């Protein structure tokens, strides 16, 4: 089957169409703007899969309807999913704009004095607003000379932020969310909302009963040689942690081996269900070899599976990580307990950064007073105002141990194309695999246990659905915190010391939900959240605006907030603007 091509970014150089001197004098400058924009994006951006982003430039500058149509024909044939219009001069507004209502679009109007690029930008944006097709405005802060071909830092920041978010939109469109199982323990996020996926994300939902996973395992619908490779890899790399189960629930060596084998098979089969596996076709299993075109998935697990079979912790942790027995590779997005809304937050984070995501329970707010009462020690540094304990039974990406290093030698989580095998090995070495607690998981399993290094910038996010309003996005930028060992051990033991842990300190603003750490916890909309590496809340805000998902909570600096220009016409308070604009325009893929 032909592989689906990656979306490209289309660059549209627009120009003043008056011949006999005007157009001719602008052709080179205008096309050079397009080439410079394409070069910037190609140099600095990757798809989430690691491939370099490709740009497609219109064959000619666009002065009117005919050339605009020719450009659109070219873009349609090359899977262009995002467009950037560039110009240094006056052009004819509504005659030259990109009219595709579902494709993210931006306009860069050159800030120069010789020709009025700013005037075209304003005229074109007015046309976009009047026609109900929002576009992003890019206009440099400082005047440039006409022969200055450089891209100023503020323009570059907006171009790249727009391109990252726009490619995320284009990459999700037409894909599916694979729901393996149904509702887990009454968790609202696992009540998978087809309308949300279809209308806001342009995705489908593929619902598959967990018996399909059972069938694939029992009937050996997998690549058997790969299973042996996975087992050998686990034997080499897995360190096993404490077994906290009562003696009557402890498993013997043979039983533990069977649990490990099934856990690895679950990872293989869920992966194959998501993306397909051509080796299955060689076994005559053509239908199963295709997969479900899933860009994200969720596994119900509890309790209809886990009361009898090994839990999904090992499978989910390995799939969500940037490496496994096949080496370093793109992480998958698999939500535990089939929490599809947390899965979408994971998907957003992965598409924006190319990194693995940490899925966690937003478990406990620890106040400074409570910590001192319990441990006899005081919180300090980033943790001085309290922490949020993020911990789940083991589905967090192993990258979350933060044993990878940035260019300054600081702990981080890298895009998978930058991760060395040594860094992957370090993450594995920092992880223990603890037998699942019987009272939670009667069918057994292994939970990964690691502790996230401290001082690492993170952005915590969550999508929620509100009846009568639709989806909303929550964002909290902050840092991981590493507590003194004795303090950590006491706090960890009160929940479960066999699970992966991240202590998170959000950045406080002194206002609203970020008045204090308690307020962040109290305003969080669900029991789960996602950690994405870096302070990337501004990228999430731009992406949400493209999809028409209002942001109900964030601590991003106002200067970094970047939304379509039409949002400014929806009132004077920027967060109210967001709600009114999203309601006015409705979901991107209206149904």
From Swiss-Prot:
Subcellular location, record wording: Cytoplasm
- What cofactors does this protein use? Mn(2+)
- Catalytically driven reaction(s): L-fucose = L-fuculose
Indicate the enzyme's highest-level EC class: isomerase
Query: Has UniProt tagged this entry with the keyword Cell wall biogenesis/degradation?
Result: no
Q: Name one GO cellular component term.
A: cytoplasm
What job does the chain carry out?
Answer: Converts the aldose L-fucose into the corresponding ketose L-fuculose.
**Family per record:** Belongs to the L-fucose isomerase family.
Concerning PANTHER family, the annotation shows: L-FUCOSE ISOMERASE
Oligomeric form and interacting partners: Homohexamer.
What is the protein name stated in its UniProt record?
Answer: L-fucose isomerase
Q: Which organism is it from?
A: Salmonella gallinarum (strain 287/91 / NCTC 13346)
